C-alpha cells in the first residue's frame, strides 16, 4: 500500500466523526519523523495557520512541498491557539478586505466538503459601540458597498434577542447574521492532513537555523536536522517573522495578549445556540467574545471566552514571552463583564496568552522579499485579525510562489506602502 492510500485508509473523510483529540492524534502519526528527500519545488517555513493552508494549496496543485515547523502542530506559543476565531464579512478594518473575505468563506466551505468536518459555525455576530464609532461606521460601509446583510437593531429588539448584554441607551446595536466562528486548531489539522494526503512532507519540532538565496536562483534552508533545497520559499513564520526576515523588523511589533475563559453566573444562558459571537467597541479598548463551546468537539478550555483586542499591548520577543498572565489582565476583563454582561462572571477558569504580530497601520503584509526577485514570498503582520483569512491566504501564497502573481486583490497589502513613510 502506498503512502497516499495508507493516509486515505486511516483518515480520509473520517475526520467528520473524530473528536478534536482524536484528530490531533491521527495527524501526529502522519507527520514525517525523517525525510530522505532534499529537493522540493517549494519549502514553507512555518506550519501554523497560514503555513498549513499554503502547504495544502501547493500540494493540491501537484507541487513537491516541504513544510517545516519548529514546534508541534498545532501549538500554543504563537497566534493561532484558543478554540475559536470570529469570522465576518462586513469588515470594520476596511472594505478592501471584503473580496478576500468572500473568497475565504468559499475556501472554508471547500475544506469542509473535502474532509466532511465542520470548521465554520454560523452563530451570528453582534456589534456594539458608540454612535460615532469608526469601526462600526466601516462595518456599515462595507455592508452597503458589498450588499452584506447587517441588521441595525433597536434597543427593544436587542434586549429581546441578546438579554445577556446591558448597554448604554445610545449604543449602536448591529447584527451580522452570516458571521460566526472558525475552529482554529481543527482547521490547521485538517489542512495539514489534506496537504499530506496530496503528497506534502510536513516536519515538526525542526528549527530553521538559516536560509539563503543561491546565485542559481534556488533557495537553501538549513535546520537543526537537515539541509533542503527548493526553487521557491514561502515564509509564514508568525511572530518569528522579523527574526527570519530581518529587513522587516522595522515594520513588525510583537505584542502579548491575554485571553480568559470564565464561569458565568447563568451558565446555560451563554452556551452555543443561546449566545452569539460579539464585538464591543468602547473608546480606548475593544473587546470580543464567544459562546461556551463543548470541549469534546472543540477542544479546551471550557468556559465563556472573551479577550481584549489591543494591538498596543506589551511588546515582547516571541522566544522570551512571559506566559504568566498579570492581575491587570484579568482585572480589565472582569470590570468589562460586570459593566456590560452582568451575569457573565462568577469566577475565572483559565487565563492564557497569545501573540499579535502588528504592522504600523494594522493591515497585513503579503508580498515578495524584493531583493530575491520572486523566489521568496511571505505573509505577516496579521495584527490580531488574520485567522479568518487563513483559507484564502494559503491560496494567494501558492499563486505568488508558483505563478508569480495572484488574481486576488491584494495590492493594498504590499510592503512598499511603508516606504513612503520611511518605515
What is the predicted function of each stretch?
Residues 60-79:
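Glycine-rich FAD pyrophosphate-binding loop
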Residues 45, 228-239:
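Short hydrophobic core segments
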Residues 84-161, 170, 286-287:
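Dinucleotide-binding Rossmann-like beta1-alpha1 core, especially the glycine-rich loop
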Residues 5-27:
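N-terminal export signals
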Residues 56-60, 118-121, 227, 239-374:
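Active-site substrate-recognition segment that forms the wall
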Residues 132-198, 203-204, 210-217:
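Flavin (FAD/FMN) cofactor-binding and adjacent substrate-gating region
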Residues 38-40, 223-232:
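Core beta-strand elements of the Rossmann-like FAD/NAD(P) dinucleotide-binding domain
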Residues 339-423:
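C-terminal catalytic lobe of FAD-dependent flavoproteins
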Amino acid at each position: 500500500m502506498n503512502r497516499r492510500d495508507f493516509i486515505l485508509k486511516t483518515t480520509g473523510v473520517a475526520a467528520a466523526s473524530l473528536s478534536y483529540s482524536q484528530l490531533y492524534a491521527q495527524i501526529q502519526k502522519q507527520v514525517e519523523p525523517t525525510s530522505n528527500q532534499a529537493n522540493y519545488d517549494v519549502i514553507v517555513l512555518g506550519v501554523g495557520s497560514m503555513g498549513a493552508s499554503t502547504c495544502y494549496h501547493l500540494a493540491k496543485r501537484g507541487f513537491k512541498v516541504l513544510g517545516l515547523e519548529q514546534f508541534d502542530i498545532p501549538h500554543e506559543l504563537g497566534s493561532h491557539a484558543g478554540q475559536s476565531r470570529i469570522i465576518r464579512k462586513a469588515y470594520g478594518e476596511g472594505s478592501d478586505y471584503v473580496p478576500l473575505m468572500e473568497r475565504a468563506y468559499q475556501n472554508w466551505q471547500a475544506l469542509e466538503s473535502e474532509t466532511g468536518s465542520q470548521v465554520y459555525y454560523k452563530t451570528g455576530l453582534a456589534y456594539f459601540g458608540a454612535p460615532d464609532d469608526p469601526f462600526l461606521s466601516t462595518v456599515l460601509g462595507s455592508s452597503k458597498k458589498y450588499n452584506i446583510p447587517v441588521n441595525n437593531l433597536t434597543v427593544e429588539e436587542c434586549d429581546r434577542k441578546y438579554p445577556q448584554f446591558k448597554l448604554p441607551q445610545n449604543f449602536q446595536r448591529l447584527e451580522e447574521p452570516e458571521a460566526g466562528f472558525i475552529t482554529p486548531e481543527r482547521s490547521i489539522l485538517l489542512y495539514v492532513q489534506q496537504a499530506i494526503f496530496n503528497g506534502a512532507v510536513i516536519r515538526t519540532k525542526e528549527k530553521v537555523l538559516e536560509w539563503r538565496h543561491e546565485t542559481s536562483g534556488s533557495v537553501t534552508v538549513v535546520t537543526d536536522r537537515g539541509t533542503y533545497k527548493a526553487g521557491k520559499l514561502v515564509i509564514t513564520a508568525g511572530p518569528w517573522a522579523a527574526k527570519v526576515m530581518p529587513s522587516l523588523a522595522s515594520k513588525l511589533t510583537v505584542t502579548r495578549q491575554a485571553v480568559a475563559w470564565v464561569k458565568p453566573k447563568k451558565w446555560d444562558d451563554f452556551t452555543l445556540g443561546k449566545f452569539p459571537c460579539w464585538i464591543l467597541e468602547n473608546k480606548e479598548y475593544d473587546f470580543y467574545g464567544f459562546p461556551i463551546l463543548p470541549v469534546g468537539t472543540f477542544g479546551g478550555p471550557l468556559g465563556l471566552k472573551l479577550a481584549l483586542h489591543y494591538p498596543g499591548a506589551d511588546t515582547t520577543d516571541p522566544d522570551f514571552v512571559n506566559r504568566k498572565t498579570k492581575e491587570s489582565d484579568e482585572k480589565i476583563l472582569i470590570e468589562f463583564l460586570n459593566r456590560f454582561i452582568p451575569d457573565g462572571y462568577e469566577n475565572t477558569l483559565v487565563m492564557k496568552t497569545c501573540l499579535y504580530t502588528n504592522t504600523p497601520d494594522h493591515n497585513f503584509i503579503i508580498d515578495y522579499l524584493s531583493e530575491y526577485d520572486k523566489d521568496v514570498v511571505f505573509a505577516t503582520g496579521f495584527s490580531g485579525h488574520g485567522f479568518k483569512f487563513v483559507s484564502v491566504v494559503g491560496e494567494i501564497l501558492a499563486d505568488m510562489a508558483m505563478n508569480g502573481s495572484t488574481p486576488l486583490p491584494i495590492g493594498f497589502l504590499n510592503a512598499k506602502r511603508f516606504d513612503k513613510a520611511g518605515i
